[in-house]
A protein has these predicted regions:
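Glycine-rich, small/polar surface segments that engage phosphate groups of diverse ligands
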Residues: 171-220
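The catalytic Nudix box helix
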Residues: 33-68
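Short, acidic/small-residue loops that bind anionic groups at enzyme active sites
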Residues: 197, 237, 251-276, 287-292
Length: 319
């Protein structure tokens, strides 16, 4: 039996390729998550923000840290002890610089680790990430509700389902139309909703005032880029030109290998004409059939999440 427990706060930072940021401390051989021991009376959240800033020069945004729970494993460097870690999930673009106790940083694919891992990572957390890699999704949809009432039902079902499964929702930040319907349903069921909206659309789309967090950016391009930085997957609800723009932007980037994140079309009847057009383009030789086949089409949240979590990235077009 371990003689003592070592309590730490740590963070799982994930990049657009699905890799996880790991660090090796000076004088040790195994890689672990960034973080460390809380100081007296310091919360787990404050501790991980402080430690990551001191050791890697990264300023974590507290609003974007998602609690994962508490994990226990054999300590990597202290014989006869267990490490008890309060973990947070952070999906964002970061540039770590090793400092203080850190000797080395590495971005690690949980499925094919290229470094030696501490037991907490190898035995507990990475298997969970492999089984359920999707923790945050971008929801693309319209700022209007459309003419078909089933659109709102789809949006509400998606928002509620994401909340019930503990999946964070990132969307365009509006409170009207299907955007608002999905966000309200997620919030009403205890979910975390982050909005990203350009300044010039704050008044036009009426920014949602009740979100978990709202970011205001300068341009539509920055909105798409920011949403992409924060998520593990993309889900498209019914929408118009803006929704199509967001979908094709994410899909093109996927084809080029700029990210390895699944894309889903939620509501098969609405998206049937789009899928038909894409198949026609594939038949004409303008799109690879493999890229069309990797798109997920779903009608229920359970079906959607199973498909997102079991998805395999296609080979990049120009690889």
């Amino acid at each position: 039996m371990p003689s003592s427990d070592i309590h730490v706060s740590a963070v799982v930072v994930r990049n657009s390729r699905g890799e996880v940021l790991c660090v090796r401390k000076k004088g040790t051989a195994l890689f672990q998550f960034p973080g460390g021991k809380p100081e007296f009376a310091e919360s787990s959240l404050d501790a991980v923000i402080r430690e990551v800033n001191e050791e890697l020069g990264i300023s974590l945004d507290a609003a974007l840290l998602v609690p994962m729970g508490t994990y226990r494993a054999v300590a990597a460097n202290e014989v006869g002890s267990d490490v008890v870690a309060d973990l947070f999930y952070y999906s964002d673009s970061v540039q770590p610089v090793a400092a203080a106790e850190i000797a080395e940083c590495a971005w690690v694919n949980p499925s094919v680790p290229n470094v030696k891992l501490a037991p907490l990572l190898k035995d507990e957390v990475f298997p969970e990430l492999i089984a359920n890699p999707v923790r945050s999704v971008a929801v693309f949809t319209g700022a209007s509700s459309g003419r078909n009432h089933t659109n709102a039902i789809l949006a509400e079902a998606l928002g509620a389902g994401l909340a019930e499964q503990g999946v964070r929702m990132i969307y365009g930040g509006g409170k009207v139309g299907l955007m608002g319907a999905a966000a309200d349903a997620c919030l009403a069921n205890g979910g975390c909703v982050i909005g990203v909206i350009p300044q010039n659309l704050v008044d036009g789309e009426i920014a949602h005032a009740g979100l978990s967090h709202l970011e205001i950016v300068d341009t539509m391009y920055q909105r798409k880029q920011r949403m992409s930085d924060l998520v593990d997957a993309y889900v498209c609800l019914p929408g118009g030109a803006g929704t199509l723009d967001e979908f094709f932007d994410a899909w093109t980037a996927q084809q080029l290998g700029l990210h390895r994140k699944p894309i889903a079309l939620f509501g098969s009847s609405f998206w049937a004409p789009t899928v038909s057009m894409l198949k026609h383009m594939a038949d004409e030789g303008f799109i690879r059939q493999d890229d069309v086949d990797t798109l997920i089409v779903a009608d229920t949240v359970d079906e959607l999440l199973v498909a997102l979590n079991s998805w395999a990235a296609p080979c990049p077009k120009w690889n």
